[in-house]
Amino acid sequence: MNRYVSVLALSGIAVLAGCVAPTPKPNDPYYAPVLPRTPLPAAANNGSIYQAGFEQNLYSDRKAFRVGDIITITLNEKTQASKNANSQVGKTSKTGIGLTSLFGAVPNTNNPLGDGDLSLSAGYSGDRATNGKSSAGQGNSLTGSITVTVADVLPNGIIAVRGEKWMTLNTGDELVRIAGMVRADDISTDNTVPSTRIADARITYSGTGSFADASQPGWFDRFFLSPLFPF
């Protein structure tokens, strides 16, 4: 008996452990800054007016376009979703049978109780109806800015960027992570790009600490909210 109790206890702990969301940790290698693949050769400072180390093409600008360059992303995300459903199903049926004779004979319809004549007629009626309503709504808003690095440049000129920002507050840590693809034409002259212009964007806003823990249900509540709960 004790063995079965131990097995059930361990199974319950495993189920509850699977319901716990993973806590984000800093220094994720995926979001680490990306450095240039090959270092640029050092240019000799051999001129007082012109130096090769600070040369720039006549038609180029200071926008990020190489691996390891820095670019600032302006976060301006706002989503609003709602859904309503209303369904009604109904069915009505009615059946009546009227008989005046039974096998060719007319039975005696006198009621011995004196409440009227008896009849062979019969009837049936039934109604069924089902109504269902459901509604759901969700809204999110995220504003701010984060500076990331260029992780890769595709052959067609699309720039892959990713990075993260951690902020340590009195009650815990807050983080913002972002990764996606940016067109070079969408980068403004001040080397910024809005988050709405990022393709395949992966934006994460989370945190740790007392505030984040307070928003999470306890282990007992997670047990009843688990999809494995039979009721």
From Swiss-Prot:
<feature type="signal peptide">
    <location>
        <begin position="1"/>
        <end position="18"/>
    </location>
</feature>
<dbReference type="GO" id="GO:0009427">
    <property type="term" value="C:bacterial-type flagellum basal body, distal rod, L ring"/>
</dbReference>
<dbReference type="GO" id="GO:0003774">
    <property type="term" value="F:cytoskeletal motor activity"/>
</dbReference>
<keyword id="KW-0732">Signal</keyword>
<feature type="lipid moiety-binding region" description="N-palmitoyl cysteine">
    <location>
        <position position="19"/>
    </location>
</feature>
<keyword id="KW-0472">Membrane</keyword>
<keyword id="KW-0564">Palmitate</keyword>
<protein>
    <recommendedName>
        <fullName>Flagellar L-ring protein</fullName>
    </recommendedName>
</protein>
<dbReference type="GO" id="GO:0009279">
    <property type="term" value="C:cell outer membrane"/>
</dbReference>
<comment type="function">
    <text>Assembles around the rod to form the L-ring and probably protects the motor/basal body from shearing forces during rotation.</text>
</comment>
<dbReference type="InterPro" id="IPR000527">
    <property type="entry name" value="Flag_Lring"/>
</dbReference>
<comment type="similarity">
    <text>Belongs to the FlgH family.</text>
</comment>
<keyword id="KW-0998">Cell outer membrane</keyword>
<dbReference type="GO" id="GO:0071973">
    <property type="term" value="P:bacterial-type flagellum-dependent cell motility"/>
</dbReference>
<keyword id="KW-0975">Bacterial flagellum</keyword>
<feature type="lipid moiety-binding region" description="S-diacylglycerol cysteine">
    <location>
        <position position="19"/>
    </location>
</feature>
<dbReference type="Pfam" id="PF02107">
    <property type="entry name" value="FlgH"/>
</dbReference>
<keyword id="KW-0449">Lipoprotein</keyword>
<comment type="subunit">
    <text>The basal body constitutes a major portion of the flagellar organelle and consists of four rings (L,P,S, and M) mounted on a central rod.</text>
</comment>
